[in-house]
Amino acid sequence: MGSIAESSPLMSRENVEGIRKAQRAEGTATVMAIGTAHPPHIFPQDTYADFYFRATNSEHKVELKKKFDRICKKTMIGKRYFNYDEEFLKKYPNITSFDEPSLNDRQDICVPGVPALGKEAALKAIEEWGQPLSKITHLVFCTSCGVDMPSADFQLAKLLGLNTNVNKYCVYMQGCYAGGTVLRYAKDLAENNRGSRVLVVCAELTIIGLRGPNESHLDNAIGNSLFGDGAAALIVGADPIVGIEKPIFEIVCAKQTVIPDSEDVIHLHLREAGLMFYMSKDSPETISNNVEGCLVDIFKSVGMTPPADWNSLFWIPHPGGRAILDEVEARLKLRPEKFRATRHVLWEYGNMVSACVLYILDEMRNKSAADGLGTYGEGLEWGVLLGFGPGMTVETILLHSLPPV
């Protein structure tokens, strides 16, 4: 009598290959819906220094306040949204100090707050998608705060009432490049699981790193001038149902690159006093010196010749700050309007870490449709999304934009 492997057709190589092919989608992963959400408390940037120094009991630091105010006014941010106001912060003097132990209180705020904000964005994306929750097969949740077990993906699935057999993935503590990371994950999941529909959610709360000003640590002051709270969600899937699902962008290729010898350019450390932020003045130059290589690499990896003029693409770079955008724009010889969507989101919301590039996707598709352009990508077919963050890590996503329907 032969072995099971010899006699069973289920164990044949041909059968395994057939199963593999049957599990794969036919087409490319597409973004089918986008939703965004932010907390209710609005803080105009031109008066943020007054609020910040008052809320942190630091008004006696007159010269430091003047310096911080100048920093705020150079950011090209108009306003930001937070899940706290001054009255709320008065309950937590350990958070508004510079380095008092405060992680427990920060965690108590972030652990429930992050999935709750993510739920708001997810519901908007699901409503636009128009399909029942039961069609969601995978969940990718991303945040840089509220580390806990069960993790934020579990909590969000429970809040939404997703099926208990949804495949969940949690992306913790990746920082500002992670909006690109989740698109890379979603592409792989959608294309390797036929019929799958991936709910992608990024949610960020800045209270994990909020702290009072300190003359010897201006990096944190810069962080406090840039970051805002927000959440964004996508539905990603391949082979959209014609007439029912409405694809916006195709995720053609996704690649991650670590810039050599750049680990100290941007780094953050979670400590008893919360998330400590460190950023070198060299960060804009480090990114701009390496971004073109990432772009050339992704085009060549799919057998395409990189464009002779980068202005022929639509652009969704992460708005790490005004200086980073200015340097990248100059290095690639881009016209000022190419970063319109990114600069608009930076002005309206600040730097929302991983959620930012998803907000920019939403802004670009909405403006393109409102202007009657031929594609959601400002009338252009091809574009790139760029995530920059600690490491230094660059996520490069090649997108193909589709016409509005």
UniProtKB/Swiss-Prot annotation:
Family annotation (InterPro entries): Chalcone/stilbene_synt_C, Chalcone/stilbene_synt_N, Polyketide_synthase_type-III, Thiolase-like
Keyword check for Acyltransferase: yes
Active-site positions on this chain: 176
Annotated CoA binding sites: 283, 320-323
Cystine residue pairs: none
Annotated SUPFAM superfamilies: Thiolase-like
UniProt xrefs under CDD domains: CHS_like
Keyword Membrane: no
Stretches for region Disordered: 1-22
MF-aspect GO terms: acyltransferase activity, transferring groups other than amino-acyl groups
Biased amino acid composition, Polar residues: 1-10
Enzyme Commission numbers on file: 2.3.1.-
GO biological process assignments: flavonoid biosynthetic process; polyketide biosynthetic process
Annotated site residue numbers, Determines the polyketide chain length and product specificity: 209
Swiss-Prot/TrEMBL keywords: Acyltransferase, Flavonoid biosynthesis, Transferase
Oligomer status and interactors: Homodimer.
Protein family per UniProt: Belongs to the thiolase-like superfamily. Chalcone/stilbene synthases family.
Further information: A.arborescens is a medicinal plant rich in aromatic polyketides, such as pharmaceutically important aloenin (hexaketide), aloesin (heptaketide) and barbaloin (octaketide).
Function noted in UniProt: Catalyzes the iterative condensations of 8 molecules of malonyl-CoA to produce aromatic octaketides, SEK4 and SEK4b, the products of the minimal polyketide synthase for the benzoisochromanequinone actinorhodin. May be involved in the biosynthesis of the octaketide barbaloin.
Protein name in the entry: Octaketide synthase 3
Species assigned in the record: Aloe arborescens
